[in-house]
Design a protein with these regions (language model features):
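Long, charged amphipathic helices and adjacent flexible linkers at domain junctions
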Residues: 93-104
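An anion/phosphate-binding loop that grips the pyrophosphate of nucleotide cofactors and donors
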Residues: 121
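PLD/PLD-like phosphodiesterase catalytic module centered on the HKD motif
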Residues: 1-48, 53, 57-88, 95, ...
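Glycine-/acidic-rich phosphate or pyrophosphate-binding loops and their flanking alpha/beta elements
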Residues: 107-118
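Glycine- and other small-residue-rich loops at beta-strand/loop junctions that grip anionic moieties
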Residues: 103, 107, 129-130
Length: 247
């Protein structure tokens, strides 16, 4: 197991690290200088759970998150290989190069794939993210809305991205935001669904750090490879969009 140590990770994960070590689990701290934000659990090199949520039970009942069980052999092999590389690599200030696979979008090289998905949208783009701050993503959403793509975004309110919300709203995106009450639904899920057929889902928030610096992983799925997953994400997004207050 690799546990994040950067930002507030060391403090958050210290108790778990000690408990796992005491149980003879091979657990290792990620390098201090890099945020390891990837959320995966790989079992027997046959199945990888790829998620948007942290393994922190206090948030299970109030956070919107999702996990996808991936049994594609190429995906699972690449996820396992990248884990092995991360586990053994010496600290360098940047995550090692990940093992590529067609359905995987790795950070720190994720931004181009995210922009491509948005730029290729013809009819619609639906977005949830804990954060909305990356300049290039904002520009892509702005352009999509202005060319007539139906752009919908669901967030939890936060002053840190109020200007971003105002910008994409002015371009034509419809942004619905849940109030940050501490007890109501908190949007932590990270998805981009385009034309109700192509889905990015995983750990990347729409921030520059998340897309270009951290270790992160999202799946790139569609209605041919994972129709049930896409349908479930679409249905859940529609429900959250309807429930969250609009402008």
């Amino acid at each position: 197991m690799i546990l994040d140590a950067a930002f507030h990770g060391h403090k958050t994960n210290a108790e778990a690290f000690q408990e796992l070590s005491d149980a003879a689990v091979d657990v290792k701290w990620a390098p201090n200088g890099v945020i390891y934000h990837q959320k995966t659990i790989t079992v027997d090199d046959t199945t990888a759970a790829v998620g948007t949520g942290n393994l922190t039970p206090q948030y299970y009942s109030t956070s919107r998150d999702a996990w996808v069980l991936d049994t594609n052999p190429t995906d699972v092999a690449a996820i396992a290989a990248t884990f092995d590389t991360d586990y053994t690599a010496p600290p360098s200030g940047r995550p090692p190069e990940a093992t590529p696979a067609p359905n995987l979008i790795w950070s720190p090289t994720a931004r181009a794939s995210f922009l491509q998905h948005i730029d290729q949208a013809v009819q619609s783009v639906d977005v949830t993210s804990e954060e909305l701050k990356d300049r290039a993503v904002l520009s892509a959403l702005d352009k999509a809305a202005r060319r007539g793509v139906n752009c919908r975004i669901v967030l939890t309110e936060n002053p840190a991205w109020a200007n971003a919300v105002a910008e994409v709203s002015a371009a034509g995106c419809s942004v619905h935001q849940f109030p940050d009450t501490g007890t109501g639904l908190y949007i932590h899920e990270k998805i981009i669904l385009t034309d109700n057929t192509k889905l990015i889902i995983g750990s990347q928030n729409l921030t520059t750090t998340s897309l270009l610096e951290n270790r992160e992983l999202s799946l790139a799925l569609d209605t041919e490879t994972a129709p049930d997953v896409v349908a479930a994400v679409e249905s859940t997004f529609d429900a959250d969009y309807a429930a969250a207050p609009g402008p």
